[in-house]
């Protein structure tokens, strides 16, 4: 009877990661849960802080000069965009979160997988982890992008059209022109200095590649072997088209788009493999030998155990 009570205590402790304090003191467990959630939100805020500061402040990009014969910045400014910022953000985030909601629902309620999170509801815990990791990567990707834009200050392909400098006051024979004044609208001129690297390319590649890897980890149905590769191909092509549209819209140079693709892919891989648990090996919780009830063992095993104890 004493061994049986000890077994029940071990099983109860294992429900909360082997911590009897959390089982006996729900208030302490709740305060710890709130503290961990606040810490996660703080980390998410800090990851996106550079992006927030740059987008909401008057920080101006690096004032880069130009060559009068540079044909790469003489393109006309197009009205409108093939894919504007609102569409990019809405589609990228909505598709990703809907996919995560569906995938975690299938994993928790259909495959009956459990979560070791301090959050009691396993579905809520799974959503919290996966959506949180995804948004954390979004914040990192956008912060990287904006830091590069203001630090490098590369001129967009339509820069001269937006800047509209007074060439009568510029001596093009000196080569590289640094002292010049733009007659165009200042806000548009500052935006025309943020070519490297493409934010559309980096954000679209991050969100779509994250989804590709998420499908690889969660989409385990073997009924149609080509369905998952088709979905993954479609997602990558959506990101690819988004980046290419920035070149045809005269918003970015091809190298800006390639750099954006590389940055988005790098952040997605780092988040998936080093932050999330999508590809981590699942471990099963095993009880210590002392928690095994002796009445469930055969007489041979009991004699063998007694022999080892005597030795």
From Swiss-Prot:
GO molecular function: ceramide-1-phosphate phosphatase activity; delta-catenin binding; integrin binding; phosphatidate phosphatase activity; sphingosine-1-phosphate phosphatase activity
Gene Ontology cellular-component annotations: adherens junction; basolateral plasma membrane; endoplasmic reticulum exit site; endoplasmic reticulum membrane; endoplasmic reticulum-Golgi intermediate compartment membrane; Golgi apparatus; Golgi membrane; membrane
Cytoplasmic-side positions: 1-33, 107-123, 216-226, 280-311
Post-translational modification: N-glycosylated. Contains high-mannose oligosaccharides.
Topological domains annotated Extracellular: 55-85, 145-194, 245-258
InterPro entries: P_Acid_Pase_2/haloperoxi_sf, P_Acid_Pase_2/haloperoxidase, PA_PP_rel
UniProt superkingdom: Eukaryota
Keywords: Cell membrane, Endoplasmic reticulum, Glycoprotein, Golgi apparatus, Hydrolase, Lipid metabolism, Membrane, Phosphoprotein, Transmembrane, Transmembrane helix
Alphabetical list of CDD domains matching this protein: PAP2_wunen
Known regulation of activity: Magnesium-independent phospholipid phosphatase. Insensitive to N-ethylmaleimide. Inhibited by sphingosine, zinc ions and modestly by propanolol.
Assigned EC number: 3.1.3.-, 3.1.3.4
Recorded metabolic or biological pathway in which this protein acts: Lipid metabolism; phospholipid metabolism
Record localization: Cell membrane; Basolateral cell membrane; Endoplasmic reticulum membrane; Endoplasmic reticulum-Golgi intermediate compartment membrane
Residue(s) carrying Phosphoserine: 19
Transmembrane segments: 34-54, 86-106, 124-144, 195-215, 227-244, 259-279
Chain intervals for the UniProt region annotation (Mediates interaction with CTNND1): 276-311
Reaction catalysed by this enzyme: a 1,2-diacyl-sn-glycero-3-phosphate + H2O = a 1,2-diacyl-sn-glycerol + phosphate; 1,2-dihexadecanoyl-sn-glycero-3-phosphate + H2O = 1,2-dihexadecanoyl-sn-glycerol + phosphate; 1,2-di-(9Z-octadecenoyl)-sn-glycero-3-phosphate + H2O = 1,2-di-(9Z-octadecenoyl)-sn-glycerol + phosphate; a monoacyl-sn-glycero-3-phosphate + H2O = a monoacylglycerol + phosphate
Similarity section: Belongs to the PA-phosphatase related phosphoesterase family.
Domain characteristics, as noted in the entry: The integrin-binding motif mediates the binding to integrin alpha-5/beta-1 (ITGA5:ITGB1) and integrin alpha-V/beta-3 (ITGAV:ITGB3) and is required for the function in integrin-mediated cell-cell adhesion.
Protein name from the UniProt record: Phospholipid phosphatase 3
Source organism (scientific name): Bos taurus (Bovine)
Native organism taxonomy: Eukaryota, Metazoa, Chordata, Craniata, Vertebrata
């Amino acid at each position: 009877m004493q061994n049986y009570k000890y077994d029940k205590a071990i099983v109860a402790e294992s429900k909360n990661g082997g911590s009897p304090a959390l089982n006996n003191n729900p208030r302490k467990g709740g305060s710890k849960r709130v503290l961990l959630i606040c810490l996660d939100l703080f980390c998410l805020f800090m990851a996106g802080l550079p992006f927030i500061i740059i987008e909401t402040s008057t920080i101006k990009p690096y004032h880069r000069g130009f060559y009068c014969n540079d044909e790469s910045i003489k393109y006309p400014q197009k009205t409108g965009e093939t894919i504007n910022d609102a569409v990019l953000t809405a589609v990228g985030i909505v598709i990703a979160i809907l996919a995560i909601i569906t995938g975690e629902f299938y994993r928790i309620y259909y495959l009956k997988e459990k979560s070791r999170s301090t959050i009691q509801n396993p579905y809520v815990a799974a959503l919290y982890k996966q959506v949180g990791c995804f948004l954390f990567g979004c914040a990192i990707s956008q912060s990287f992008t904006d830091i590069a834009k203001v630090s490098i200050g590369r001129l967009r392909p339509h820069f001269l059209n937006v800047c509209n400098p007074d060439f009568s006051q510029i001596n093009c024979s000196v080569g590289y022109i640094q002292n010049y004044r733009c007659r165009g609208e200042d806000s548009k001129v500052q935006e025309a200095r943020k070519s490297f690297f493409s934010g559309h390319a980096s954000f679209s590649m991050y969100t779509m590649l994250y989804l590709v890897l998420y499908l690889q980890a969660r989409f385990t149905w073997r009924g149609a072997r080509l369905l998952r590769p088709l979905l993954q191909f479609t997602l990558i092509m959506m990101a690819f088209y988004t980046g290419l549209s920035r070149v045809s819209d005269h918003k970015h140079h091809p190298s800006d788009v390639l750099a954006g693709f590389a940055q988005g892919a790098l952040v997605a891989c780092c988040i998936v493999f080093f932050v999330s648990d999508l590809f981590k090996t699942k471990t099963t919780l095993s009880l210590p030998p002392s928690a095994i009830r002796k009445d469930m063992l055969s007489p041979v095993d009991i004699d063998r155990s007694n022999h080892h104890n005597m030795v």
